[in-house]
Amino acid sequence: MGDCVAPKEDLIFRSKLPDIYIPKHLPLHTYCFENISKVGDKSCLINGATGETFTYSQVELLSRKVASGLNKLGIQQGDTIMLLLPNSPEYFFAFLGASYRGAISTMANPFFTSAEVIKQLKASQAKLIITQACYVDKVKDYAAEKNIQIICIDDAPQDCLHFSKLMEADESEMPEVVINSDDVVALPYSSGTTGLPKGVMLTHKGLVTSVAQQVDGDNPNLYMHSEDVMICILPLFHIYSLNAVLCCGLRAGVTILIMQKFDIVPFLELIQKYKVTIGPFVPPIVLAIAKSPVVDKYDLSSVRTVMSGAAPLGKELEDAVRAKFPNAKLGQGYGMTEAGPVLAMCLAFAKEPYEIKSGACGTVVRNAEMKIVDPETNASLPRNQRGEICIRGDQIMKGYLNDPESTRTTIDEEGWLHTGDIGFIDDDDELFIVDRLKEIIKYKGFQVAPAELEALLLTHPTISDAAVVPMIDEKAGEVPVAFVVRTNGFTTTEEEIKQFVSKQVVFYKRIFRVFFVDAIPKSPSGKILRKDLRARIASGDLPK
């Protein structure tokens, strides 16, 4: 019998902060409102546009009323509802109400085209849509065909219910719901490391764990308290905002100031008026703050925490923003929808903060494990060596909805979620992201799936082949550009192709440049060699 070789141990990294107790058995809504006895009469939500304010007790009660209203409309435990909404108080009531009902919320971008919304409606099998009147036309025909109820938060068109009907329901008529911690509560859509958008199943346990990793314990990684005012400018259909603002904000008892869309002057006015203390942002907002000359006219001294996520932030931009917020700690977090979403967070935000390095995106969150692996061999790597970032813990997704194959390629047999991002962990446990294995393009923090745009381009009668890759852009971070092979004899122009795409997709998926080539580089198995195309862009070797 040959020698027995011991398996090589994984090199696993953990947070500098000690693990904490996490009440993973609690439903998400119970967990978020667990401290309501201390904050019940305090302002919970402020509508920035109108000044309307809701206390914690009112938000909790209205959420239970919405749950009862959903029940009366026939929404059962395990059913899915779609939130097709901008940021608004109703977003909170609808999401939390669905959670109380034991239902699932799938969040869709209201700027999606009709085709994009319907694709998500079909995939998620949503039974009800909560939206605004201006978006009803996108879904009304499909909803009528499938007998899906539409509810509007403003003036309800014909055949639509008004959201007030849900808020007027009697919460005492809501039947008791027994929620399993492994039940799905949120279903955002993400392209993951490759391919088309897929439903990401986030459970009660997963979101409770993710929120606790950030804001719970004696020394929270993200220190927030009941005197804080947090601005909600990031769209709640994005998991970063849903988690870091809605869930973390409620758990920590902060006041959440809601803005529908980013506009620099109203944004600065609200920060000054309400003395905002916490700003969860993305790089395009950080860039606007750094470059806008009007910023200096406003008093931003109340802001103590500026966190940036969804895409990396450069050192120069970090320094420019620090100058605008004199009393703020600035740092980055790193997330991925499938990871719940937070993998790493800056320890400068902790109650007892640590010194951090510029350009780092934090250290791995508590109650989780991280490793860096060689993308070719899957062997774990030591500090300061670049490899694929992997995360393991209760916060990660249950899997992709109805897609076991994609789930298996993302979460391995040992429970490690493979992110498709390349990075390294330094001697001080700080994580740096340097590249991306995955195909996703990040436009202002929004995901763009190349496969989706390639499939669309190939429906054009004069295009025989196409590939979509990112190009660096100062304002957007990255923009999608297309390499296109024209069908023999056709002289289709760049502008014609750009218009063809823009009519069918949301604004951030529009093609910014089209380069005509004789062939798309591919591997022997037929896979597009995106690295070759990215290298051509980087070197400036582009067709005229």
Swiss-Prot record:
Similarity annotation: Belongs to the ATP-dependent AMP-binding enzyme family.
Keywords: ATP-binding, Ligase, Magnesium, Nucleotide-binding, Phenylpropanoid metabolism
Gene this chain is encoded by: 4CL1
Binding site for CoA: 261, 444-445
Lineage, uppermost ranks: Eukaryota, Viridiplantae, Streptophyta, Embryophyta, Tracheophyta
EC identifiers of the protein: 6.2.1.12
Region annotation (SBD2) ranges: 333-400
Cofactor(s) listed: Mg(2+)
Organism: Petroselinum crispum
Gene Ontology MF terms in the entry: 4-coumarate-CoA ligase activity; ATP binding
The protein, known as: 4-coumarate--CoA ligase 1
Pfam families on file: AMP-binding (PF00501), AMP-binding_C (PF13193)
